[in-house]
Amino acid sequence: MQNSASEFLKPRLIDVQPVSATQARVAMEPFERGYAYTLGNALRRILLSSMPGFAPTEVSIAGVLHEYSALDGVREDVVDILLNLKGVVFKLHGRDSVLLTLKKEGEGAVRASDIDLPHDVEVVNPDHVICHLAAGGKIDMEIKVEKGRGYQPAPARVKQDDNRQIGTILLDASFSPLRRVSFSVESARVEQRTDLDRLVMDIETNGVIEPEEAVRSAARILIDQLSIFADLQGTTVEVVEERAPQVDPILLRPVDDLELTVRSANCLKAENIYYIGDLIQRTETELLKTPNLGRKSLNEIKEVLASKGLTLGMKLENWPPAGLEKP
C-alpha cells in the first residue's frame, strides 16, 4: 500500500505554555498509540546531545601556571574560579569563537558583567559571580569561548602541534544549551477514538535558545537523519577513490642513472640514497657530512642535477610513493 503512511493520524494541536523565560511545556496531540513514546524519546535525546551552544574552553590568569594555584587577594582558589566560570552563559552572534578579557581590582564580587565584551558577544546571566576580591586584590584573565555541541573533555581537544602558552588552562566544555528535558505521555481522544496519545515535553534551557525553538531544531535534525530511509532506492553517494599523486618519472630513477663516479655513487648508497627523488631532498650541508664525499663530488652531483633541471634541497610531498622499494 503506497499511501499507508497517510492513514496514520498526525498531531494537529500544539500547545506551548511558557513557565519562565527559559522554561516551557510543549504538548502535542494526537498520536497513534506508541508513537508519542517513540518520538518523545528521540526528540529528548537529540535535544540533550545535539543542540549547538557556547562554552569557555581555555582560560589564562595572570600569575597562575596551573589550576591548583591560589591567588593573593582572591577568596576562591583557581579550581573554584574555573568552576564558577563554567556557569557563565555566553551567546556569540555570527562567530564561532572569541577571546575575552576580564580585569578587575578592589574589594567586592567579580561578576560575569565585568567581562569586556565586543558588540557581537552577549552574556545571558550577567549577575553570575565568578569570584570575590579582598581589599587590594585584583584579577586579570583571558577567556576563550567557542561554539560546539554536547560535552567535550579537555584532553579530547589537546593536539600534538598545540602551541598554547604556558599557563593556559583547558576546560571541560559543556556546550549544550539544554539544562533539562523530560517527557510524559497522556491519553488523548479524537471523536470516538480513545486509543490515542498526547506527548508533553518539559524543557528548560540556559537562555541561549528558547524552548520552542529548541524543539523545532531537534525535529529538523530528526527529519534530516530519517529522510534517507524514505527512499532506499534513491540516489547513492558516489565514493570517489582518491588517486595517488603523480610523481615525476625522473625522480623514480636510481642514482646510478646519473652516471656519477663510482666513489660518489657508493657514498650516496651508504646514506640510503637510492633514487633521484631521495637525492634532491638532501641539502649541501647534509651531503658534505657524508663520509668520503667531498666538495669535488658535491659539485659533480650539483652539475648533473642541474642538467636535468633539478637542484638539491627540494621538497617533495608524499615521498617515497607507496610500493617503492630499494633497487
Curated annotation (Swiss-Prot):
Record GO biological process: DNA-templated transcription
Gene Ontology CC: cytoplasm; DNA-directed RNA polymerase complex
Disulfide pattern: none
InterPro entries: DNA-dir_RNA_pol_insert, DNA-dir_RNA_pol_RpoA/D/Rpb3, DNA-dir_RpoA, RBP11-like, RNAP_asu_C, RNApol_insert_sf
Region: Alpha N-terminal domain (alpha-NTD), residue numbers: 1-233
Ranges where the record places region Alpha C-terminal domain (alpha-CTD): 247-327
Key word Phosphoprotein present: no
Record's keyword annotation contains NAD: no
Superkingdom of source: Bacteria
Molecular function as annotated in GO: DNA binding; DNA-directed RNA polymerase activity; protein dimerization activity
Enzyme Commission code(s) on record: 2.7.7.6
Function: DNA-dependent RNA polymerase catalyzes the transcription of DNA into RNA using the four ribonucleoside triphosphates as substrates.
Domain notes: The N-terminal domain is essential for RNAP assembly and basal transcription, whereas the C-terminal domain is involved in interaction with transcriptional regulators and with upstream promoter elements.
The name this protein goes by in its record: DNA-directed RNA polymerase subunit alpha
The gene coding this protein: rpoA
